[in-house]
Structure formats: C-alpha cells, structure tokens
C-alpha cells in the first residue's frame, strides 16, 4: 500500500507524453506524425487507462482504510519564505481522479471516430491529453499555489478547446467570452490566496485549516477581512463552475466539438470549481456567512439554469443550461453542509451528462447528412423528430440518461438528487421548495429535449411548425408557445405526392424507385413504407432519413449507460442492518473533519423518494402533454379546442407562456445586460480614452514637437550667416521699438 501512495505522482504525468510527442512531431517530422495520426488516439486511451487503473487501486485502499498520504518537496528555502510542491492523496483526490480518467477514456474513444474527418485531429488529441493532465494536477495538488497553477492551465485548455474551430467567428467569440469571465474568477482566487497567506503565513491545506480555525475561535483575525478573502476564493469557483452571475460563458462553450462539451460538463472544467469548494470546506465552515453565501448562490443558479433551459432550440445549449442547474444543486449541497450528497451528485451527474452529450453528438452526426453541417441546423431540435426509428441505440441511451437526470429510480441521479432534496428541507423549507420545484422543471425540459428529438416524425422537410396544426403525415408538437401554420417545403420534400383523397382518407404515394403506388389509411404506416427511399431533386441526391452511428461511437455510450445504471447503488442511504453496503460513507469522507452518519431508515427514505419521484413524473407528464405526439393527435381532432375555449383565462395563459418563453429564449436577459451594460459601456469608455489619448495627450506632445520644429527652423534661417538677414532683423526690432514709443508716448 505504501508503494502505491509513493508512486501516485505518475497519475499527473502519464497523459503528458501524448501532448509533448504530438507537439514535437508536428514541429520536426510533420509528415510522419500525420501519417500515423490514428495511433495517437490509441496511445491516449492506453495512458489514461493506466491512470484509471491506478485510481481504482487508490480508491479501493481509500474505501478500506481512508489513508491520507502527502508528499512535499521544497523548491525555495529561506528564513522568511518556503515554496513547497507535492501531491495529496485522500478520498477526494481518489474519487476525482477516477472520475476524470473514466469519463476521459470514454470521450477519447468517442473522439477517434467523431473527429476523424477533421483536419485538426492531432491538435485535438494534444489539447485533450493536456486538459486531462491539468485536471489531474489540480485534484492532486497539496497547496493553494499548486491549485492556482493548474487552475490556470485548465482555463487555458478550455480556451483552446472551446475555440478549436477558431476560423468560425462565433467559436472565436465564445472562447474569448469564456476566457474573460474566468479571468474575473481567477483574479478573485489569486487575491483570496494572497489574503489567506497574509493571515496564516502558509499555503498548505492542513496548516491553513488549523491556523484559521484557531484564529477565528480566539478572535485573532479581522472577521471582515477573513470573510472578504473567503468570498474571493469562492469567486474563483463561481466562475469556473458557471454559477450565477458568471454562468453566461458555459452555454456559449457549446461552439467547441461535442466531445469537448462532454468532458467540460462532466469531469473537468466545471468540476474544478466544485472540487475547490469541497477541498476548502473546512475553511469555509469556520468563517461566518460563507456557507450561507454558497447555498444562496447554489439555489439561485439551480432555478435560473432550469428556467433558461425551457425554450432552447439547440440540443447542446439545452444540455448546457441543464449542467448549470445541476451544478447549482451540488453547490447548494455544499453550502448546506451536505458534503456526501454533493460529491455523490457530482459523480452521478458526470456519467449521466457525459452520456447525454455524447448521445447528442451521435444525433448531430446522424442529422448532418440530411440538413447540412451548419450547427444552426444539425443541432436544431425543431428540425429533428422521429429519430427513434433511425437511431434506436442512441435513442435508448439518451432516454436512460434523460430519465437519470430527471431523478427516476433506480438510475444514478435519483439517489444523489433525492439526498440533496432531503437535506435541503432540513436546512431551509424555502430552499427545499425551490429545489423540489426545480426538480419538476428538470424533468420537464429534459423530457422536452427527448420528445423533440425522438418523438413524432422527422420535421426536417417542413417549415413553420405549429402545435395546433396537423401535418399531412403525422402529428407534430414543437413549441408550447405556438408558431405559424405548417408549410411543406416542396423543394426539399423527399417524395412525390400524386393524389390525396380526403373523402375516404387515403393518401397515394409514388416513388421514383418503384413502379407501383402505395396506399395506406394510417399516416405512420405510410412513412414506415418509405423510410429507405432516396429521391433525385434539382440535380442533387437527398437522403431522406438519418442513420445510426458507427460502433466506435456507440460503445462509449453503452459503457456510460452501464455507469448510469449501477453507480447510484454505491450510495444506498438507508440502514442495511448487519451488512453495510454504503460505500460512499466509507469513501466520500472529508479528510480533515469527522464524517457523519448518513444512514436513514426505510420509511423515511421511501417517504422522501415517493414525493421527489412524483414531482419528476409530473414534470414528465406535462412535457408529454405539450410536446408528445399523442397530445398533437388530440389537437388534430379539435378535442382540446372543444374543452378549452377562447376566453380571458386562455388569453392570460398565453401571455404567461409568452413571458416564460421570452425569458428563457433571451437567456433571462442577463447576456443582454452584460452586452449593453458592461461590454458596450467599456467600448464607449475605451473610445473616449482613445480620443483623449490620440487628440489630447498626443496632440499636446505633437504640438510641442511641431512648435519646436518651426522655432528651430526660424532660428536656423535667421542665423544662417547672411548680412541681409541680420540687417532685416535689426530694422524690425528698431521699427517695433519706434512704434511702441510713438503709440504709448513714453
């Protein structure tokens, strides 16, 4: 066991050779490096698998003994200052390293196929390996200065990966936005580190916690200054984990490749802020008001993220706001003191969200041959629908990930979210009500994403859909807020309609690849008969329907499904009696504080679970009403209009729906406020400063220079040695003297 801890530093350096090898290879032997480019994916997966094996070994030892190991090496030694670097192995380190390595392996395997067509394939894997290295260095850091170094490296990698397709202006703008917002948090983090070093004289975690605890209890430090430093530290976590009000960068980070989105949202970028708060929890507990601030930011973020996800049309952006909301749950749990539930939900959410993002990438790839390679089309859920027929494996995995995030048992997120909801009720009934309400919203918008993507039939060849109009072929329900009547895009329609007999309700179809005519009374059956046809229109082939992804893409999805099914079982919270299966109570313990007993009895667990699941099921039901194909069928039969007549209540309901839609679609007007209130103000100020600098400061300097030039030229001309010039100057002086003498009458 000692040898395992002594050589734990290799966790940090194992993924690094891939980045260095690709970099030197592209620099010195670019042709050979590009010829064997697919080999680098295998090497990346192999090295990260070694990290996973090492992390599993550490996790087993932590579960059995919770042994803490710290190694320090001094870099600078003098009487006043000592800078030490090392690594810390504790339960938090082991769980984070295992999470990073497992999700990272799945993302790398997925990326080999997903990015195979991209010219930046090698650059992508170099960035990914360095991203994993930076995150592993962050979670193994033994002091605050190391955390800050790797914190900056994580931010740099996210900047490079979000702007991976930097030739696209929107991607370049997104990575700049993420970089600038994280600069705000990083500046606060650095000031907080310097403040606590000034208070304690140490940057090591154990010394820092002990000294601050003693100073607080003995009134040996200014409370206001300590609170300020703690708030600055928390500001870094707010920016990195996309908490309100610095959350606006995360939805725009979707401009990067989809595997990057999965890694950022699951195990790296956003997990860094959660890790920092979890690591510094013993420090935050003893400082007044900080835990209240953390819980307040968490409750605001979880509600805000859920409301902003309600009306998004981009599948990746909807998942991004879902991440914001779920991170709010984790931050709330940390703020109310539920350390175990917070880390538990971090684990379950990571696997579920990685599954959803990789599934969305499979969906996007299947839609690209149909709608084109523009993200505005391939990621637009309005153009999807009915994909369950064409991508059945992706649909099944996406459904399981959706139900997990909705909190449906026995999937992973049910266990962790239910524990957070229960603990929040003990902390504050108001917070609990908001958390339960947001759980219902989560089920609503996540099932909305699923229904818009997989339910109904493919809408790519139709325009201006309406939830109140009937399609010629199937029932559609796209937006709860309503749109214009349905129009058929005749130019892109992949089949030809010869005749429609309304009286006997028959539709006749003709295929260019068939001599016969197909008849059917049921629209869905007609579509099933045509799903493999291809037609030739306007000198181009049009593939009618998407297709399932390749096995190298589906395999990571199936593995993540397995994690989603079983990872929640390690945290069974109720009392098991003689045999204790609660691995989390042994594993997810705070290394610097005594762990609490988290077991509950069966009755309490079932009571809380029934209520939380009922809320989630209600959200699923509402989503199926507004977006399901069954509801649209009722609308087509005018049953809804028969029971719900136009009146004051209906008008009020429409107004409420429009307000919610505008709030969600415009991102809560927060981006608009930042753009007009901050960005435009800064630009106007910069233009004013530029004018002042160019025309005032430079004008004075240049004016003095020009005046000096003309004076010098005049003196040089007069003093050139010509007698005529001297005589002219003399006569001028005499004339001026005589004029003054005559005028003033001296």
UniProtKB/Swiss-Prot annotation:
InterPro entries for the chain: NADH_UbQ_OxRdtase_chlpt_su5_C, NADHpl_OxRdtase_5_subgr, ND/Mrp_TM, NU5C-like, Proton_antipo_N
Chief place of localization: plastid
Keywords in alphabetical order: Chloroplast, Membrane, NAD, NADP, Plastid, Plastoquinone, Quinone, Thylakoid, Translocase, Transmembrane, Transmembrane helix, Transport
GO BP annotations listed: ATP synthesis coupled electron transport; electron transport coupled proton transport
EC number: 7.1.1.-
Pfam families: Proton_antipo_C (PF01010), Proton_antipo_M (PF00361), Proton_antipo_N (PF00662)
Enzyme class, spelled out: translocase
Chain segments annotated as coiled-coil in the UniProt record: none
Catalytic activity: a plastoquinone + NADH + (n+1) H(+)(in) = a plastoquinol + NAD(+) + n H(+)(out); a plastoquinone + NADPH + (n+1) H(+)(in) = a plastoquinol + NADP(+) + n H(+)(out)
Domain of life of the native organism: Eukaryota
Compartments it resides in: Plastid, Chloroplast thylakoid membrane
S-S pairs: none
Record family assignment: Belongs to the complex I subunit 5 family.
Role description: NDH shuttles electrons from NAD(P)H:plastoquinone, via FMN and iron-sulfur (Fe-S) centers, to quinones in the photosynthetic chain and possibly in a chloroplast respiratory chain. The immediate electron acceptor for the enzyme in this species is believed to be plastoquinone. Couples the redox reaction to proton translocation, and thus conserves the redox energy in a proton gradient.
Oligomeric form and interacting partners: NDH is composed of at least 16 different subunits, 5 of which are encoded in the nucleus.
Protein name: NAD(P)H-quinone oxidoreductase subunit 5, chloroplastic
Species assigned in the record: Dioscorea elephantipes
Gene encoding the protein: ndhF
